[in-house]
Amino acid sequence: MAPVALEQENHLRDAEFNRAMHGKSAQFRGGFAALRGKDSAAQKAAVDEYFKHWDNKPAEDETEETRAARRAEYATLTRHYYNLATDLYEYGWGTSFHFCRFAQGEPFYQAIARHEHYLAHQMGIKEGMKVLDVGCGVGGPAREIVKFTDANVVGLNNNDYQIERATRYAEREGLSHKLSFVKGDFMQMKFPDNSFDAVYAIEATVHAPDLEGVYKEIFRVLKPGGVFGVYEWLMTDAYDNDNPEHRRIRLGIELGDGISNMVKVSEGLTAFKNAGFELLHNEDLADRPDAIPWYYPLAGSFKHMTSPWDFFTIARMTWWGRGIAHRFCGAMETIGLFPKGTQKTADSLAIAGDCLVAGGEKKLFTPMYLMVGRKPE
């Protein structure tokens, strides 16, 4: 694959669009409450810009040129995806936008936090370290890792709306003295060389057009001797791009999750090593012999539910829960309380959910390929 040309950043343009689309909705509670504060014209622009990469482009007709067009606009694609999907994520999943492993008897949000703790533990993050969270979302993992380690964390994000929400949550939890958020493209960070004691990424660098490129940027800003840890989204090496069903699953995941270019485990490992890291540990945590699969909430599987408090999280993911959300979003669009495109975005998330479950069941996809590496002294 040819080197990817980086998109030119324009923070003023992005800030103006954020104000136009989201207004003051970053100050609202997450989920459906925040959807009521959107500007319809800006929402339509985001919908059109995002879905132009997917509409009328089925898996059976996919070409390398189609994928190259998505890679060329990786930053815009990701930014508009989260302009559209953030509130729906918070409604359905909470403020930590990632998957996790589950233990018997473990409530959903406890399992989510444990997954974050496990990465911090594997990396050896300690009190007082200066740590970078690459692709921080609305700051759920960063807040948890600050509380778990007492490190100082900087969250990097290319979406203004998510930064506003992350900043608000940090202030509300009294963590602003330990946690800050910076606007930027992780393919071309503005931090000086050797800035951070440790860097982590939780299911975020999958949005890169080229994993080697983002890993090299992380290597650059990491201090010598520092450690980088990542939970990466990858197709397993059982994935066959010439298999139409495999390709449909991958494309469904990419469509519903704002991904321009997902690759296989072997390519991810090569990218990690080529970036210069000394590989300390690599493992597909989805391959652990867990009794409860990582994708069970997406499957709407009550049989694996271990806490009554998880009922509503699981219920939202059932076929009838998704059906209710589909009809509710459509009705709210019709009466003008939600902007047009909300239902289409929610439907794309449902497609992704089905494909994530299929990818997990068929061992074609993992959202938790763990790689930990050190930058040589």
Curated annotation (Swiss-Prot):
Means of activity regulation: Specific and total activity is decreased in presence of alpha-bisabolol.
Gene Ontology terms: biological process: ergosterol biosynthetic process; methylation
Primary subcellular site in the record, as a coarse category: other
PROSITE patterns reported for this sequence: SAM_MT_ERG6_SMT
GO cellular component, one term: endoplasmic reticulum
InterPro entries: Erg6_SMT_methyltransf (IPR050447), Methyltransf_11 (IPR013216), MeTrfase_SMT (IPR030384), SAM-dependent_MTases_sf (IPR029063), Sterol_MeTrfase_C (IPR013705)
EC number: 2.1.1.-
Catalyzed reactions per annotation: lanosterol + S-adenosyl-L-methionine = eburicol + S-adenosyl-L-homocysteine + H(+)
Cell compartments where the protein resides: Microsome; Mitochondrion
Keywords: Endoplasmic reticulum, Lipid biosynthesis, Lipid metabolism, Methyltransferase, Microsome, Mitochondrion, S-adenosyl-L-methionine, Steroid biosynthesis, Steroid metabolism, Sterol biosynthesis, Sterol metabolism, Transferase
Involved pathway(s): Steroid metabolism; ergosterol biosynthesis
Induction text: Expression is significantly suppressed in the presence of alpha-bisabolol.
UniProt superkingdom: Eukaryota
S-adenosyl-L-methionine listed as a keyword: yes
A Pfam family: Methyltransf_11
GO molecular function annotation: identical protein binding; sterol 24-C-methyltransferase activity
Function according to Swiss-Prot or TrEMBL: Sterol 24-C-methyltransferase; part of the third module of ergosterol biosynthesis pathway that includes the late steps of the pathway. The third module or late pathway involves the ergosterol synthesis itself through consecutive reactions that mainly occur in the endoplasmic reticulum (ER) membrane. Firstly, the squalene synthase erg9 catalyzes the condensation of 2 farnesyl pyrophosphate moieties to form squalene, which is the precursor of all steroids.
Additional facts recorded: In Aspergillus, the biosynthesis pathway of the sterol precursors leading to the prevalent sterol ergosterol differs from yeast. The ringsystem of lanosterol in S.cerevisiae is firstly demethylised in three enzymatic steps leading to the intermediate zymosterol and secondly a methyl group is added to zymosterol by the sterol 24-C-methyltransferase to form fecosterol. In Aspergillus, lanosterol is firstly transmethylated by the sterol 24-C-methyltransferase leading to the intermediate eburicol and secondly demethylated in three steps to form fecosterol.
Family listed: Belongs to the class I-like SAM-binding methyltransferase superfamily. Erg6/SMT family.
Name of the protein in its database record: Sterol 24-C-methyltransferase erg6
Source organism (scientific name): Aspergillus fumigatus (strain ATCC MYA-4609 / CBS 101355 / FGSC A1100 / Af293) (Neosartorya fumigata)
Source species taxonomy: Eukaryota, Fungi, Dikarya, Ascomycota, Pezizomycotina
